[in-house]
Swiss-Prot record:
GO biological process: L-histidine biosynthetic process; methionine biosynthetic process; purine nucleotide biosynthetic process; tetrahydrofolate interconversion
Keywords: Amino-acid biosynthesis, Histidine biosynthesis, Hydrolase, Methionine biosynthesis, Multifunctional enzyme, NADP, One-carbon metabolism, Oxidoreductase, Purine biosynthesis
Gene3D superfamilies assigned: Leucine Dehydrogenase, chain A, domain 1, NAD(P)-binding Rossmann-like Domain
Residues holding NADP(+): G169, R170, S171, S194, I235
Name recorded for this polypeptide: Bifunctional protein FolD
Organism listed in the record: Microcystis aeruginosa (strain NIES-843 / IAM M-2473)
Family stated for the protein in its record: Belongs to the tetrahydrofolate dehydrogenase/cyclohydrolase family.
Entries under Pfam families matching the protein: THF_DHG_CYH, THF_DHG_CYH_C
Length: 285
């Protein structure tokens, strides 16, 4: 049995809709606050993909009326220099959100730098206090990519409660926080990873399947239950194009919903980053 009509989960369209709402909210709040919300993005080195992501974030800020403060450091910048900039941004009243663009050069400890960001300005939702708040189910800043996945599922009215959700990947960026968010919505959650022995058997049992590994075409048609919802978080460069972790053409034949790459989760991550920054701004009212 195969599903003949698969609906595309259009992250680009939803992200634009969210950003439109954020822009309207900013226009309303700008006068009482005396300034727009501000997002600072720290980038170290010359990773081409990171440079594209940073430009996209800056463009999105401009589009909705949010101030952006880009900080670009050379590859050989010391951890102390980055730390000094984080301390300065923590104290800057114009800045409501701080993001460190990952990955960082190998000589820098991303975790220790993330820990130095004021939790109230943690636009990426990766500070231990915010991750701990997620574990406890508190109202806190949520990790952007997992929050974007959840927003997509909710926008398309996809049932989550009681469903078996399989997350492939256990990173602190996506896999672990997403599993917690799905659990919060009463899904039964399985996390699969590089040491999982029976991956295809597990993915075939998923009502909601979220690969987040960074390995092109990892999930093939035969690994997906007919009618499953597939949200592809992976982004991989293959020759001259970007692809996800899913064999798109094959899985399109069996899934009931599927995200494209690009145009699926990526734009949602940026929208959630802006939403988190606006939330931090609003909490100063």
């Amino acid at each position: 049995m195969s599903v003949t009509t698969c609906q595309i989960l259009d992250g680009k369209a939803l992200a634009q809709k969210i950003q439109l709402g954020l822009g309207e909210r900013i226009q309303t709040l700008k006068s009482p606050m005396g300034r727009p919300p501000g997002l600072a993005v720290l980038m170290v080195g010359d990773n081409p993909a990171s440079a594209v992501y940073v430009r996209n974030k800056e463009k999105a800020c401009t589009k909705i009326g949010m101030a952006s403060f880009g900080r670009h450091f050379s590859t050989d910048t010391s951890e102390l220099e980055i730390l000094a900039e984080i301390v300065r941004l923590n104290q800057d009243e114009r800045v409501d959100g701080i993001l460190i663009q990952l990955p960082l050069p190998k000589h820098l400890d991303a975790v220790s730098l993330l820990y130095q960001i004021d939790p109230k300005k943690d636009a990426d939702g990766l500070h231990p206090l915010n991750l701990g708040g997620l574990v406890r189910g508190e109202d806190c800043i949520r990790s952007c990519t997992p929050a974007g996945v959840m927003a997509l599922l909710k926008e398309y009215n996809i049932p989550i409660a009681g469903k078996h959700a399989v997350v492939v990947g256990r990173s602190i960026l996506v896999g672990k926080p997403l599993a917690l968010m799905l659990l919060e919505e009463n899904a039964t959650v399985t996390i699969a990873h590089s040491r999982t022995e029976n991956l295809a058997e597990i993915t075939r049992s998923a009502d909601i399947l979220v690969p987040a590994v960074g390995k092109a075409n990892l999930i093939t048609k035969d690994m997906v239950k007919p009618g499953a919802v597939v949200v592809d978080v992976g982004i991989n460069r293959v020759a001259d194009r970007l692809v996800g972790d899913v064999d798109y053409a094959g899985v399109l034949e069996v899934a009931s919903y599927l995200t494209p790459v690009p145009g699926g989760v990526g734009p949602m991550t940026v929208a959630m980053l802006l939403k988190n920054t606006l939330l931090s701004y609003e909490r100063k009212l």
